[in-house]
Swiss-Prot record:
It is found in: Membrane. This is Gallate transporter. InterPro entries: MFS, MFS_dom, MFS_trans_sf, Sugar_transporter_CS. The chain crosses the membrane at residues 26-46, 62-82, 92-112, 123-143, 155-175, 183-203, 262-282, 298-318, 326-346, 349-369, 388-408, 414-434. Keywords: Membrane, Sugar transport, Transmembrane, Transmembrane helix, Transport. One of its GO terms (molecular function) is carboxylic acid transmembrane transporter activity. Transporter that specifically mediates the uptake of gallate. Belongs to the major facilitator superfamily. Sugar transporter (TC 2.A.1.1) family. It holds the Pfam family MFS_1. The gene is galT. One of its GO terms (cellular component) is plasma membrane. CDD domains: MFS_PcaK_like (cd17365). It is a multi-pass membrane protein. The lineage of its organism: Bacteria, Pseudomonadati, Pseudomonadota, Gammaproteobacteria, Pseudomonadales. It comes from the Bacteria.
Amino acid sequence: MLKPPVDAPIDVKDWIDNRPIAAYQWLILVLCFLIVLFDGFDVAVMGFIAPSLMQDWGLSRAAFGPVMSAGMVGLAIGALTAGPYADRLGRKKVLLIAVSGFSLLSLACAFARNPYELAVLRLLTGIALGAAMPNCTTLLAEYLPTRNRSLMITIMFTGFNMGSGLGGFLSAWLIPHHGWKSVLLAGGLLPLALLPLLWWLLPESARFLAARQAPASQIAAALAKLGGRFAAGTRFTVSEPTTQHKAPARQLFSERYRFGTLALWLTYFMGLLVIYLTMGWLPTLLRDGGLSIERAATITGLFQIGGAVGAIVVGWIMDRRNPNRVIAIAYALGGLCIVSLGALSLESSLLVVGVAAAGFCMSGAQTALNAFAPGYYPTEFRATGVSWMLGIGRFGAIFGSLIGGAVLSLGLGLPLLFTLLGLPAFAAALAILANGHARLRATPAVTAP
């Protein structure tokens, strides 16, 4: 069926919102899921190969520390720098460059001759990895109807956990037979094999094309893959704020977005602070409390499993209720679960339930925030908004990794330690509620010629 007359511009967002999900949108989800899966694999890979690598090179934990931290710093740099480029060059171009980058650099890591070379390569790999995830989020969000966006983006993000798990299984199989370098080679070759499919099948965002006032024929061709047929001369629009292509980063701090942007940053920072503190130091807390290493690791693993389930559930609820309140409630419940762990016996079965529930709420809220952010910003600087939130949040992860040891060395009791651990979760809940009070003014639409 042909679309409205040529004198009636078609709003790309409304057009997508008013149609059932097409097979091509599911294909975009699968492709983005695979990118995030390989992203998760590569982010976690150093932890899996560290024991073998340190033994092979005769390194102490202290000497290997810069290699581990270099990748995390790179993730923050990549997230902060990639967004503005994606808002100017396009989501697909930057995404292809990012995947090519972390694939080739992962291969290069396998041939590093010393920890200094490896640290530099992991920094560069982290930059490419940091650029990939926010662009996956933005591209997928711009092709999804609002009614399903949160759920489908959270499904995409479960690929990160699955990629981390895949890294563990592959490492357990490859390292005994082929050594630690084989894991890095696998981490480079697998996404490299995906690149031709991404180049061929992954589209540029139709909303990005409309916001940049690309020729209507390009927009029509992109929407045709979703089943659209348009009369010759049809014009396309995005009914969103327009800034006449001013620097995307500047728009984050404009009067309209400044407060909400800072609230998002605080939310993401605090959420990752809690998650990295928990994942990094909970095994040590449990071990110091008398549990075996195996049981401490198993209980901590339930945090991630609960998080994968929580991400999908929170995303599903977000599509049906006020997203700010849903995320705030999840963070607050996560904080309560973490605080309650300090009152439980380490031998109690309730401890297992409490850790899984904390992961369900905390990781569920954190992943849901990834789905929330694309809807907060307009197309013109959406990639910048999402990527800067992720980049600032990475500093929460770095801070959490750094202060954990110092806090444990204070010799505080478990109840007080878990209370301190839960406090940032309540701060995250308040911050996302504050974001809900940021009001956006209506502005004219942008029409593609």
